[in-house]
Amino acid sequence: MNFRFVLRIISYILLIEAALMVPSVGIALYQQEWNALYGFCVTYAILFLCVGLLFIITKNYQRGHFFAREGLVTTGLTWIVMSAIGCLPFVFSNEIPHFVDAMFEMVSGFTTTGSSILLNVEEMSYSLLFWRSFSHWVGGMGILVFLLAIVSVGGKNGGFTMHIMRAESPGPASGKIVPKMKDTAKITYSIYAALTVIDALLLIIVGKMPVFDAVCIAFGTAGT
């Protein structure tokens, strides 16, 4: 088991999660939701501390070979770590003060389970509601598939993309649209994003729905 390689991938995943939270931070600033903004700031501090520690631990890592067991471990750790970090804005903003409840909410999002501990999601701040909805969209295709589409981290045997796609993609099997798995990930995510945009536009134009509500609902619809 190439643990250092797996941990280095997790550090890249955390950096992607940091980027994914940026729109929510922008919404918090625009809406002047200071408690939510505080929650995101503390989360960023913890996230970058974790990334720094992971980079130190994996300083002399070697890519080596990447097999199915590494793919399964990477996928499992990604769900756990992303959910644990992703739930912190809810905790530190005090909108979902209990860590277990917030963790449940994010696991539900990133795994597209759809369950919730919230009785009325509309009572949440705009920024955290957006982050909650966005987690459903990210989990719909899988964050590791997104990583494949934008970053080159393949192992020596070229097995990284194949085993990650098999472990992360929905359905009993994953095939190639084009010869390279990386290109397949790009095409798949492009189609996924396009369908989400079309969904949101239909809700806005036909359903006469406010833009924010339409986008959040489109995230959840596309993810499931």
Task: Describe every region a protein language model picked out.
Residues 1-224:
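Membrane-proximal intracellular helices of multi-pass ion channels
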